[in-house]
A protein has these predicted regions:
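Conserved C-terminal helix/tail region of periplasmic/extracytoplasmic solute-binding proteins
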Residues: 73, 167, 400-453
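Conserved N-terminal structural module of periplasmic/extracytoplasmic solute-binding proteins
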Residues: 4-10, 14, 22-111, 319, ...
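Short, solvent-exposed loop/beta-turn-alpha elements that line the ligand-binding surface or hinge
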Residues: 36-37, 122-133, 192, 199-201, ...
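Extracytoplasmic/periplasmic solute-binding protein
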Residues: 148-152, 157, 181-232, 238-241, ...
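Extracytoplasmic ligand-binding clamshell segments of periplasmic binding protein
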Residues: 197, 221-306
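Mature extracytoplasmic/periplasmic domains
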Residues: 301-312, 338, 342-415
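Hinge/lid segment of periplasmic solute-binding proteins
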Residues: 36-39, 106-157, 214, 317-325
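A structural signal for short loop-to-beta-strand junctions that line the ligand-binding cleft
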Residues: 91, 98-100, 129-164, 199, ...
Length: 453
């Protein structure tokens, strides 16, 4: 998930949260049997949801079910991804202003769990799903074997192609990573429709979240823990193999700008589209400029022919034009991709921990997990993956998620992302004459950020 925060702000996270939270509290172990709806009529708790990924249908289910089961009121407040960390830093230490339950990006979780911002919910782990919960997300929310946040939902990345353009270029869907790299370079060279600045694979110059798949596929990583210290690994030999492939794609398959990130790549695979600002106002137009993009699974709702539904513009998927497939790895199995999604936890300063735990029970219930899947969000509990369906998007999502990875669980990882240093590094790869020297330069810049607490 996207998270941006000024570095100076993030370095104060630990001080602010530790001042109020100490080492992190333990949520009450009282069961739902102690909840008296009549006694809770005047009580309320607040849930922070990040961005708009949770559909209105699910929000209504949460508020209605919470009211029915507890008698209390659930207030849902949506927080933008751009300032979520800043708001968490300010609100979580303050018992008078803290939200009771918080959704955060899975890569943000380690920063806050390591400094006591969330209550210990280890006593609920088995009840909420136990080993069926997404392991990498559970790990991101754990400290010293204790659980502080758990998975909320998962989203996996896969490839969307203009099947018609691939066919016109005479290129088949690849079965290995090498075949994919060759295919998109060939399509760029063939450019069957003679489109200006055409990309066989649109990969933004600063798009590290998708590019990292090539690093993972070559057994590299962004960082690793050595003893008690985290170190950046951009210059490790295996990582450099992946970076060399990325550089080749930047130079020979993608005409994306060197400062383009991972936002809205579908604008370039649709026949026509609009560039919208934060308020939803159109600021420009795009036309077909790429044969392939990589994006989270929910992007398929933004891909297709333009149609009208209830007087509104919608995208209608067209199997004759579009297709989805999993990025293949070197061995033909799904390549490792960066998992998207969120974790969720109870604030250590919540004044209503029992009610907060009731909300967690509702979120991890079979009913809600199935609702997540039915709305295209990967359930936290693998038992409910069938709710995703069996169409090409569900199949790609499940296959892609089977080999997904998270960013390093370093306490300062949010500082790395917020500093935009990875965007800066990847933006220099295309024109780098010495990848190893560039990687070593940025290893030295990233190392101190990784260990911020």
């Amino acid at each position: 998930m996207k998270k941006y925060l000024g570095l100076a702000t993030l370095t104060t996270v630990a001080a602010l949260v530790l001042t109020a939270c100490g080492g992190g509290s333990t949520a009450s172990t009282d069961s739902s049997a102690t909840i008296d709806p009549a006694a809770n009529a005047d009580k309320s708790i607040t849930l922070w949801l990040a961005g708009g990924d949770t559909p209105d249908e699910l929000r209504t289910y949460l508020t209605d079910t919470f009211k029915d089961q507890t008698g209390a009121t659930l207030k849902i407040e949506e927080q933008g991804w751009g300032d979520l960390v800043t708001k968490m830093t300010t609100a979580l230490p303050d018992p008078n202003n803290t939200p009771d339950v918080v959704e955060m990006g899975n890569t943000q979780s380690p920063t806050f769990t390591n400094i006591g911002a969330f209550a210990d919910i280890s006593d609920m782990y088995e009840e909420l799903g136990g080993a069926k919960l997404i392991p990498s997300f559970v790990e991101a929310g754990a400290v010293d074997g204790k659980n502080f946040t758990l998975p909320y939902y998962a989203g996996s990345r896969y490839m969307f192609q203009r099947a018609d353009v691939w066919e016109e270029a005479g290129v088949d869907t690849p079965t290995t990573l090498e075949e994919f790299n060759t295919a998109v370079k060939t399509i760029t060279e063939e450019n069957p429709r003679d489109i200006k600045n055409f990309s066989g694979f649109f990969l933004g110059g600063q798009d590290w979240r998708n590019s990292v798949s090539w690093i993972f596929a070559n057994n590299g990583d962004l960082a690793k823990k050595e003893g008690d210290t985290w170190v950046s690994t951009l210059s490790d030999p295996d990582t450099l193999k992946g970076l060399a492939q990325i550089q080749d794609l930047y130079r020979n398959a993608s005409k994306a700008p060197s400062d383009a990130k991972d936002a809205t790549p579908w604008l370039y695979i649709n026949d026509t589209d609009q560039i919208l600002d934060d308020e939803g106002e159109a600021t420009g137009k795009t036309s077909l400029a790429a044969a392939t993009i990589m994006a989270p699974g929910w992007a398929h709702w933004s891909i297709g022919d333009l149609a009208k539904q209830d007087g509104k513009d919608v995208r209608e998927w067209n199997d004759e034009k579009f297709s989805a497939f999993v990025l293949p790895g070197n061995d033909g199995n799904p390549a490792p991709v960066l998992a998207g999604g969120s974790n969720i936890g109870i604030s250590a300063q919540s004044q209503n921990p029992d009610l907060a735990k009731e909300l967690m029970r509702i979120i991890f219930s079979a009913e809600y997990q199935n609702l997540l899947g039915e709305n295209g969000l990967g359930p936290a509990n693998a038992d409910y993956n069938a709710a995703l369906g069996d169409d090409q998007f569900a199949q790609a999502a499940i296959a892609s998620a089977s080999n997904s990875k998270l960013t390093p669980a370093a306490p300062g990882w949010a500082a790395v992302e917020s500093s935009m240093i990875l965007e800066e590094f990847f933006g220099k790869i295309r024109d780098a004459d010495d990848l190893k020297a560039l990687a070593e330069e940025y290893d030295a810049k990233i190392d101190p950020l990784l260990n911020l607490k």
